[in-house]
Amino acid sequence: MALLCLVYVIAYHALFVGALVAGHLQTHSVLNLTHLVLAVFSAINAWICVCEIALLVHSGAIRREYEGFNAKLGVGHLPPIFLFERASLSQIFSLRYWAVMWSTYSVLDPSYSDTTTFGFCVDVGNGVTTLLPTLLWAAGMTWPILSARLMGAMGIAMYWQELYGTVIYFFQYVFNRRFDRSPRAHVLGIVVPANGIWIACPALGIWASY
């Protein structure tokens, strides 16, 4: 049975965050706002890491889909958002399915359809190098499985990488006036919040790690 992709995404995040919050409450007998925010961010980042691995594996298909969107809809016009289309279980467990995230986002910033750009490389790097640390950090801040020193060192390294990479990406997006190709609503409603999350939450993670 095919459901809206958004249903799967919400269910995944609810299970991920719910498990961490319940574990923290059971272990420490307290709800903590910093833990909650970083639990939500860990869930988001782990999902995006998988999508970023799809960016690497299916870069050629992403380029072809992006060019198809431009030919059909015109430059800067978003196709139907994949989150609101139906998908089967077999599709959502396929890297190929999540590659459409990048062919869609390439309409706003063509960096993701070009393997020579900083945007492509920094996101692939995030996906390949931070998936396992994200999962380990999420578990470690919930259950006492790692020493505080190791958690702090890992958190500072991981979150600094995410923060710095996002700041440089957003700089090149603005400096190269990528926003000129998109309606202001798309820039303010998609690009700015998406990058803002990866600046604000890693900054909080660095503070918590210290």
Which residues fall in each region the model found?
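Core segments of transmembrane alpha-helices
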Residues: 126-138
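Interhelical loop segments of eukaryotic multi-pass membrane proteins
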Residues: 30-37, 57-106, 177-183
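Hydrophobic cores of alpha-helical transmembrane segments in multi-pass inner/ER membrane proteins
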Residues: 11-18, 196-208
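Juxtamembrane membrane-interface segments at transmembrane-helix boundaries in membrane proteins
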Residues: 1, 101-120, 179-192
